[in-house]
């Protein structure tokens, strides 16, 4: 439904921002800004992207060792 659409839109936007050079900390700052505005679905999308990014970075670190 619409709620899932909002979550996934912000998930993909956050991943796009990551590809363009923002790191997980930058995305966290953006997420907290949405949280202050009580836009929780947007927050959830960004949070999911941060979780995925941190997972990818961990795998990359393991592979590089």
Where are these regions (language model features)?
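Short, charge-rich, low-complexity alpha-helical interaction segments
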Residues: 1-19
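Structural recognition of alpha-solenoid helical scaffolds
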Residues: 23-26, 54
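Terminal alpha-helical segments
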Residues: 25-26, 32, 61-63
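Conserved small-residue packing positions in alpha-helical repeats and bundles
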Residues: 14-15, 28-32, 48-51
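N-terminal cationic and glycine-rich segments that engage phosphates or anionic surfaces
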Residues: 7, 32, 41-44
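Hydrophobic/aromatic side-chain positions at a characteristic register within alpha-helices
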Residues: 19-22, 35
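Short, charge-rich amphipathic alpha-helical segments embedded
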Residues: 41-64
């Amino acid at each position: 439904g619409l709620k899932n659409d909002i979550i996934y839109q912000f998930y993909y936007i956050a991943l796009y921002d990551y590809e363009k050079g923002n790191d997980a900390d930058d995305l966290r700052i953006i997420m907290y800004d949405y949280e202050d505005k009580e836009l929780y679905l947007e927050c959830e999308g960004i949070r999911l992207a941060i979780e995925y990014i941190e997972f990818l970075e961990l795998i990359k670190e393991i592979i590089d060792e």
